[in-house]
From Swiss-Prot:
Protein name: Conotoxin Gla-TxXI
GO cellular component: extracellular region
Name of one Pfam family that matches: Conotoxin_I2
Compartmental location: Secreted
Disulfide links within the chain: C26-C40, C33-C45, C39-C49, C44-C53
Tissue expression summary: Expressed by the venom duct.
Tagged with keyword DNA-binding: no
Secreted keyword on record: yes
Molecular function (Gene Ontology), one example: toxin activity
Annotated signal sequence range: 1-25
Keywords: Amidation, Cleavage on pair of basic residues, Disulfide bond, Gamma-carboxyglutamic acid, Secreted, Signal, Toxin
Amino acid sequence: MVRVTSVGCFLLVIVSLNLVVLTNACIPEGSSCSSSGSCCHKSCCRWTCNQPCLIPGKRAKLLEFFRQR
């Protein structure tokens, strides 16, 4: 009787661990996202998982302006 109970507990632990892994799955880098919490690196930038989140500054905007002329 003890052996059956321990096998049942062991199987229950395996099933519960599989459920935890499935619910904690994160979105890999480069995939589309809606919030930072769903990305693996916790960085959702412009609806894409990126690490780090790069936002162009004044210099990048100025260079883009001169390229258009």
